[in-house]
Curated annotation (Swiss-Prot):
One of its GO terms (cellular component) is mitochondrion. It comes from Bos taurus. GO terms for biological process: oxaloacetate metabolic process. This is Oxaloacetate tautomerase FAHD2A, mitochondrial. Tautomerase that converts enol-oxaloacetate, a strong inhibitor of succinate dehydrogenase, to the physiological keto form of oxaloacetate. It is thereby required to maximize aerobic respiration efficiency by preventing succinate dehydrogenase inhibition.
Amino acid sequence: MLGSSGRRLLTTVLQAQRWPFQPSRNMRLVQFQAPHLAGPHLGLESGNGGGVIDLNAFEPTLPKTMVEFLEQGEATLSVVRRALATQLPVLPRSEVTFLAPVTRPDKVVCVGMNYADHCREQNVPVPKEPIIFSKFASAIVGPYDNIILPPESQEVDWEVELAVVIGKRGKYIKATDAMAHVAGFTVAHDVSARDWQMGRNGKQWLLGKTFDTFCPLGPALVTKDSVADPHNLKICCRVNGEVMQSSNTNQMVFKTEELITWVSQFVTLYPGDIILTGTPPGVGVFRKPPVFLKKGDEVQCEIEELGVIINKVV
């Protein structure tokens, strides 16, 4: 992965660039590091391309990880609202290293075949119920970290996805109550080794989905009240600047509420848990001929209102 100086340089470059989709300027929670700080801190991104407010400096009693922050519920969110309303020192973007907004969640739940247009590109019917698989939390990396090509795979592919971050514990959650259990949303890259997903390991998807670095997340956890409609967002993936995936989250077969209801039948959802909600068409494996990632490629995954993550393949 990029070292701290390399990631800080990348965030400086990003600050000078303009992206097609406008990120939300409201409550954008981040985990970050800086040379003068001991360990990760929680922060508040001050708008598109802006610096970071150190929430732990504003309120030293706040936890320093997102999972612990979410576990404390409304009490911690009220601190963030106070921080938003206060003129606070802002760390320049060039001085911070962005981490994944959530690290070490209890679980990462993934959904397959959940875009109608993705089903059409494969000429298969839309599923009648959600197709669930998982990634291990060890696959998570930050929004500007490297994706490491494993020597075990020759068919590593891209998938941009909307990720839902759970904010409240629940089991057997009703669809009408589901959004009360959501903290917010972020951008995910469901990197996939197709040879392991589709041809090996008994065609069980897990190993092909969970190599180290196969789940970049970020750049921020955008709280649900800062997103106008999570099911009407432009979603895009570019490889080396070329648009490979371009769709809208309105193509999702099962929306956030349905997914939470379905998954919570089987497992208890905890604060910090992540649900990757599926990918639109345009992945490499279904191109003719198939196209896969190679060393030196740069992948940009972007979702309207949420932002962009940029990961180099090494």
